[in-house]
Each structure stands twice: as C-alpha cells, then as structure tokens.
Amino acid sequence: VLEKAKNGTNDFLILPLFFGRSAAIYEYLPQRMEEIQKQCGQFDLKIAPPLVDLDDSNNDDVAQILADLVREEISYNKLDFPSVTLVDHGTPRIKVNEVRNFIAEQLALILKDEVQCVKPSSMESREGEEYSFNKPLLEEILGSSKFERDVILSMLFISPGRHAGKGGDIDKICAESRKKHSALNTFMTGLFSEHEGSIDVLNKRLNQGLETEFI
C-alpha cells in the first residue's frame, strides 16, 4: 500500500483472508493506514468482510466447503458414521473463538445425517482461566466419549504450515493420542484454500467489500 500510495494510487480495497474479524485487519491495519496517509496524503480505503459473518446465520458458504472436505474423507477412507471435530489454532480473542463455535454449529446441521457428532476444539490455548473459551483442546477431545474410534479433523485453517501441514503440530497431537487410545483412528481433511469453492467465497466478499463504506 505504501508503495502504491507513493505512486499516486488513492483508492484501496483490502480483502481479508481470515475466517473472523482479526485484530490485525480491523484494528492494526486502519492505524497503519493512518500512518501511511501522513506520509503520502489522503486516500480512500475499504475493508471487505471476513470469510465468516457471525451476524448472519444463513452465511454458511465456509461451512459448506468444510462439509465437502469431511465428505471426501468419509468416502476415501470408507468410514461409517465417524465423529468430527472442527479444530482451529486457538486464540486469545473470544470474538475469534466465536467463529469456531459458529461454524461448528453450522457443520453439525449440514452433516447431521452423515456423522455421529460434530464438536469444536482448539490446537492450543494460552494458560489462564480467561482463555478457557478455547476448550476443549484437541488433545483432550481425542479419545473422549464419542471420539474413541474414527475421528475426522475438520481443519479450520486457511492453508498449510507448521501447524496444519503434514508432520505439523496437529499431526503430532494426533499421533500422541493414537498411542494413548489404541482404538482411535484420526483423519485430517484438506484445507479451505485447497477447495475450489474458496475462490467463489472470496469473490463474494470482494463484491461485498466494494459496497461497504470507506473507513
């Protein structure tokens, strides 16, 4: 943005690749834009909505994609009524955690006749009661009631990395859980960005962003 503003561009639209209203986009970014405007002069800025709108219960396009990815695992591995946990990274912000729970509820409705149950979990959490909203942790839910046998991890991650990628932190948590629970089998879905429908969701948010007010 700084380089473009220096070269005379005065109209910007930010398209967040975030499931929820990350502080990085909706708090830090406007502050950073103000600093750039002091250097380069005024310009117009819009920020498109995140991928998930908590205020619209009919906004289930992300959940539909995650459901498709779960179905792929069921079909490929020939699973019979597995349990599903929607797992995210974990967060210090309860508003971000609400996105996890919101999608888990939608996923449970979409898959109600295809899986045993759907429950949310987080990979990790900061210590302290004030962060207990992240519970249950993935390591706690694996091997627990209804999660003792075939469990699909619906991955609430945009793209692979040291957490969601092969051999990453979640892979290691699953491996440790399988050692503790001999009947447990775990299956990780593909990621949101790997589904062709993710482009349609981004395009929809782009168009919504064009209709928003300047900040």
Q: What is each of the regions a protein language model found here?
A:
Residues 1-215:
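Extended amphipathic ligand-handling, pore-lining, and cofactor/metal-binding catalytic surfaces
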